[in-house]
């Protein structure tokens, strides 16, 4: 049934910042404690509803496969918990990567909202994590990654599973930045056919086809109350929907969001952009992610493999897309590069 949320009627959007989680990918998980503290404080003062903090691949994502971080999840979370006054401290967990024990530890630090993330066809593995998070009294969202890879009706059935486990919100998560506005609309309309009106909908956009803001606007018009975004778009690939840009566009439409756009602009330019060792933007490599429908966090791994083996990053990414590789298969990027090198030398 249709979502209870109506942005055009003045209902307030729920702005979820992901600068300190998805943004970890953009800096290879190397945020310092002072960085996360200052960014979180600025976001809190600017009025965002929630701030997500974790390794880019969620709690306990630090590994040889995903990459190690400058600090532990607990150090980052504790630093942010110390400075928040209004925003809800949020984290992300992937069943099979993060355990329920880590979820409990995050709760003890002050996390009160969690997104339980699975590949778009694997909602069934989220049942335990969603259930325990609800038992802890947390706000819980289901996060269906790579939502472009299956048809809207199939995605909606996965969303329905997450709802049945206790998720209070279910996201269309465009991890590859491969959806356009029609694709977002079709998926949220499919959600309407199976989800309860009181179950919130969310959108997590990536900007690989430069559609992050447009997709988020369409999602809100289709009943999505929760909007993921990050300062300067700080995130995997070409980044997420840039928060300050989305809020400016929402202001132009007269939507209710509760954020100060000027403060967000300042935080983006003064605190976040200087940290980018690789510009977060649409360029030939990040565009290839959206074009091929590849998991956005593969970017830095593919660039490293291309440099090591003398290949073009784009050809690696396109081949990963052809093979339909998904999040968690980062170790296969080197295998693909070696296969391509053999073909060149044959």
Swiss-Prot record:
Top-tier EC class: lyase
Pfam families, per database record: DmpG_comm (PF07836), HMGL-like (PF00682)
Superkingdom of this protein's organism: Bacteria
Site positions per UniProt: Transition state stabilizer: 21
GO molecular function: 2-isopropylmalate synthase activity; 4-hydroxy-2-oxovalerate aldolase activity; manganese ion binding
Active site: 25 (proton acceptor)
Binding, substrate: 21-22, 175, 204, 295
Keywords: Aromatic hydrocarbons catabolism, Lyase, Manganese, Metal-binding, Plasmid
InterPro entries: 2-IPM_HCS-like (IPR050073), 4OH_2_O-val_aldolase (IPR017629), Aldolase_TIM (IPR013785), DmpG_comm (IPR012425), DRE_TIM_HOA (IPR035685), PYR_CT (IPR000891)
EC number(s) reported in the record: 4.1.3.39
Binding site for Mn(2+): 22, 204, 206
UniProt record, GO biological process: catabolic process; L-leucine biosynthetic process
Ranges for domain Pyruvate carboxyltransferase: 13-265
Catalytically driven reaction(s): (S)-4-hydroxy-2-oxopentanoate = acetaldehyde + pyruvate
Family: Belongs to the 4-hydroxy-2-oxovalerate aldolase family.
This protein's name: 4-hydroxy-2-oxovalerate aldolase 1
Species this protein is from: Novosphingobium aromaticivorans (strain ATCC 700278 / DSM 12444 / CCUG 56034 / CIP 105152 / NBRC 16084 / F199)
């Amino acid at each position: 049934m249709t979502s209870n949320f109506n942005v055009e009627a003045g209902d307030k959007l729920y702005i979820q910042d992901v600068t300190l989680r998805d943004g970890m990918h953009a800096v290879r998980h190397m945020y310092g404690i002072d960085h996360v503290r200052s960014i979180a404080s600025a976001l809190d003062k600017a009025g965002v509803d929630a701030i997500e903090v974790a390794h880019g691949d969620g709690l306990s994502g630090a590994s040889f496969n995903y990459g190690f971080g400058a600090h532990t999840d607990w150090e980052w979370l504790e630093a942010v918990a110390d400075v928040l006054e209004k925003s809800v401290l949020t984290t992300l967990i992937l069943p099979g990567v993060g355990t329920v024990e880590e979820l409990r530890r995050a709760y003890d630090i002050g996390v009160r909202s969690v997104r339980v993330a699975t590949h778009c066809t694997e909602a069934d593995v989220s049942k335990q994590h969603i259930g325990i998070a609800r038992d802890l009294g947390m706000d819980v969202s289901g996060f269906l990654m790579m939502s472009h890879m299956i048809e809207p009706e199939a995605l909606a059935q996965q969303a329905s599973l997450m709802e049945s486990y206790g998720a209070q919100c279910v996201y269309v998560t465009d991890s590859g930045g491969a959806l356009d506005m029609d694709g977002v609309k079709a998926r949220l309309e499919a959600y309407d056919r199976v989800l309860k009106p009181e179950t919130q909908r969310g959108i997590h956009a990536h900007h690989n086809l430069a559609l992050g803001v447009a997709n988020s606007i369409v999602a809100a018009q289709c009943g999505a109350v929760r909007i993921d975004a990050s300062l300067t778009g700080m995130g995997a690939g070409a980044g997420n929907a840039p928060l300050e840009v989305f809020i400016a566009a929402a202001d132009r439409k007269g939507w209710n969001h509760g954020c100060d756009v000027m403060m967000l602009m300042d935080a983006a330019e003064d605190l976040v952009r200087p940290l980018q060792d690789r510009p977060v933007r649409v360029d030939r490599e990040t565009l290839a992610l959206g074009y091929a429908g590849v998991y956005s966090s593969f970017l830095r791994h593919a660039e490293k493999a291309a440099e090591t083996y003398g290949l073009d990053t784009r050809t690696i990414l396109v081949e990963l897309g052809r093979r339909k590789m998904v999040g968690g298969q980062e170790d296969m990027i080197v295998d693909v590069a070696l296969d391509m090198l053999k073909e060149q030398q044959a």
